[in-house]
């Protein structure tokens, strides 16, 4: 899932224009937006078919997203998910997206995380190292035939999103996992790790 940030949208930590742009780039039809909070533990979820409805739900005065990590699904999910109770709104869900409702993989998600103690934000120096690694990975993958990715900054690292089109099955899931493991073996170091989860 693509992280949209830790935010309170009404306090403008994330600009509405930038939120619209991010959602427009990666949304694939039906998508889920999920918001997680550690203390106290709480989850909100919404299913959306269009950017305007999603942005309106996130900007609503009816929800307070202070302290939440907000992210969206990247893979294609079954249309039946839209019939869930959180259709076109952010609420405490009974159920959220899991592997069983993913029909296909639309993005290879390369997540670069600086090594740091848990619950500490990334420093500018650590983020610089993640950006440097992202450039090396981008050059390597371009050299073997990948198109340019969508590049985004997460709350504490860098995301590289490569367009793919793979049916969700065990072989393709293993292929993606092996790809991430290979990138980790080639590029992870003491300062920045390629997330293989």
Model-inferred region functions:
Residues 2-156, 163-188:
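Signature for HUH/AEP ssDNA processing cores
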Residues 192-197:
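C-terminal polymerase-core module
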């Amino acid at each position: 899932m693509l992280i949209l940030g830790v935010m309170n949208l009404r306090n403008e930590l994330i600009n509405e224009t930038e939120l619209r742009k991010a959602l427009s780039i990666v949304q694939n039809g039906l998508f889920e937006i999920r918001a997680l909070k550690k203390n106290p533990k709480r989850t909100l979820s919404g299913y959306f078919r269009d950017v305007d409805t999603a942005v309106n739900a996130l900007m609503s005065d009816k929800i307070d997203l202070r302290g939440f990590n907000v992210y969206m699904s990247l893979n294609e999910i079954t249309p039946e998910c839209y019939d869930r109770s959180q259709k076109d709104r952010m609420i405490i869900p009974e159920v959220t997206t899991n592997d069983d409702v993913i029909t296909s993989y639309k993005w290879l998600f390369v997540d670069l995380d600086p090594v740091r103690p848990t619950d500490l934000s990334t420093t500018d120096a650590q983020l610089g190292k993640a950006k440097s690694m992202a450039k090396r990975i981008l050059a390597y993958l371009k050299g073997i035939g990948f198109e340019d990715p969508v590049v985004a900054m997460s709350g504490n690292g860098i995301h590289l999103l490569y367009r793919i089109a793979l049916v969700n099955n065990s072989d393709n899931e293993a292929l993606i996992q092996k790809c991430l493991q290979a990138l980790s073996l080639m590029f992870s170091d003491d300062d920045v790790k390629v997330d293989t989860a």
